[in-house]
Structure formats: structure tokens, C-alpha cells
């Protein structure tokens, strides 16, 4: 794959697919990898940037998932979202503690628009918050770039090291201008070209399928769900005449849909 790559490191957040998708919607290819992927492996993958996802844990608990601390030394821009921001701040010497008042839902945030992350975004911007912990003290050399009524450090950055964090969720529709915030990270901070198209992905997958299948035949159980339908569509383009689909009626179709 010759496209530039944005790496999404997963810490168990429910929105990881949305993060990957909003990156791709900005024409940058993204892949989701486990949160504890080693810095050496990441250097090998050579991404233009890294996003740390949210997650249900508390960073100060001993069994909470951590990333390799060396990823902050690679010189690759990092954006921590929610748990990702707390994790970055915690690992770099900041202080994370429980909120006096948990924030859930749409909240008005006051943004410092001179931050490259918030370029061309209104100073007052409604964002989606969903957290029970907050960053009480930022690590050394980090500056605060956003606040809400209940969260003094709603975003932060260390521009010299290209480390950025947001406590809110820019990847969801409930955050105004969220896709633009992710776009700013990609284009203003990571220097992305935006060279990814879905057609490229289809071509890549078709090539992979042909290499794997060769002259063999493929038997596919097709339920009519998204996964097996997409798989069938790709296979029929990649290896026409080598594919046999068997319809699996699992009893969850609409009335008579299976017969149609």
C-alpha cells in the first residue's frame, strides 16, 4: 500500500471505527492497531501521525491499558482523544484525577483558535464530552488550548514535540466542526497530502484476493448482512467464475426477504 498512513491506536473506545472513518473521509488512509503496539513496529509502519483513542479505563489504575512510552519520542505527531489525551498527559508527567462532576453530552467549549488544531474553527464550539476523569495538571511544556465549564483542560498541546490532546470527541457528529478538527491534525500538523481514495482500497483488496486464491474456487456463506455482502461483491469482481455463494437464512431477515 503506497498511501500515506495514519495509525489509530485502540484503547477500547467505542468510537475507534468512527475515528478511522473520519480520517479516511479526509482522504487519508488509516488503520486501527492495538494500543500497546511497540514503537519499533510503529517506526517500521512509518505513519504520518498517530491517534490514541478513548476508552473506558482510568489511566491511574495499575491494570489500565498503556501505550509504549517511546511513541512520544519518535517525532511522529500524536493526537490523544479522551482517554488518549489523559494517557499521554499521565505518561509524560501530568496529573489525571476523577472529575468532581462527570461530563456527558454536548457541552460548549472555548477554544484557543491560534492552535493549529483549531484553525478556522469558531472560538465557541459545541463538543461531545463523555468522561469521568480529567487532566488536572498538564505535563511540563504543554499548554492548554480549550476549556469547558467543568473541564479546565479540555485540550492541550506541546507544539514543539507535535503532541496534541482533546478531552472531547471530534470524531462524532455531535461535535461541531469535528471532521475539520481531525482534518487540521492531518493537514496542518501531520502534513498529509490526502492521497487516499476508496477505489484504491478496492483495487488493493482485489489484488490481494487474486494472489491468495490463485486458480482455486471459493465457497462463501452469504447471509445478506453487510460483511458477507461486501465480501461477495469484492470476490465477484476479483475472481468471477471461481465463486460459489450459499445463502444462509439465519431467521433474522424481513418477511419473505430471503425468497426475493
Residue spans for each PLM region:
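RNA-binding accessory domains that recognize and position tRNA/RNA substrates
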Residues: 1-49, 56-62, 66, 72-74, ...
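Gly/Ala-rich beta-loop-alpha elbow adjacent to hydrolase catalytic centers
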Residues: 80, 84, 89
Amino acid at each position: 500500500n503506497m498511501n500515506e498512513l495514519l495509525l489509530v491506536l485502540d484503547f477500547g473506545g467505542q468510537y475507534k471505527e468512527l475515528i478511522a472513518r473520519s480520517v479516511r473521509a479526509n482522504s487519508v488512509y488509516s488503520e486501527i492497531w492495538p494500543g500497546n503496539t511497540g514503537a519499533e513496529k510503529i517506526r517500521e509502519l512509518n505513519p504520518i501521525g498517530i491517534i490514541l483513542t478513548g476508552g473506558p479505563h482510568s489511566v491511574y489504575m495499575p491494570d489500565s491499558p498503556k501505550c509504549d512510552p517511546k511513541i512520544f519520542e519518535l517525532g511522529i505527531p500524536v493526537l490523544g482523544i479522551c482517554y488518549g489525551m489523559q494517557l499521554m498527559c499521565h505518561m509524560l508527567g501530568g496529573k489525571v484525577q476523577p472529575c468532581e462532576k462527570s461530563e456527558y453530552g454536548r457541552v460548549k467549549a472555548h477554544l484557543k483558535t491560534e492552535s493549529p488544531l483549531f484553525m478556522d474553527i469558531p472560538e465557541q464550539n459545541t463538543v461531545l464530552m463523555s468522561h469521568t476523569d480529567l487532566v488536572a495538571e498538564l505535563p511540563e511544556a504543554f499548554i492548554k488550548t480549550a476549556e469547558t465549564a467543568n473541564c479546565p483542560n479540555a485540550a492541550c498541546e506541546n507544539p514543539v514535540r507535535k503532541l496534541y490532546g482533546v478531552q472531547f470527541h471530534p470524531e462524532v457528529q455531535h461535535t461541531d466542526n469535528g471532521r475539520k478538527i481531525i482534518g487540521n491534525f492531518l493537514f496542518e500538523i501531520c502534513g498529509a497530502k490526502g492521497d487516499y481514495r476508496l477505489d484504491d482500497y478496492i483495487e488493493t483488496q482485489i489484488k490481494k484476493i487474486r494472489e491468495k486464491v490463485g486458480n482455486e474456487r471459493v465457497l462463501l456463506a452469504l447471509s445478506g448482512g453487510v460483511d458477507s455482502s461486501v465480501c461477495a461483491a469484492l470476490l465477484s469482481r476479483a475472481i468471477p467464475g471461481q465463486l460459489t455463494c450459499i445463502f444462509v437464512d439465519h431467521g433474522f431477515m424481513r418477511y419473505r426477504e430471503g425468497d426475493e
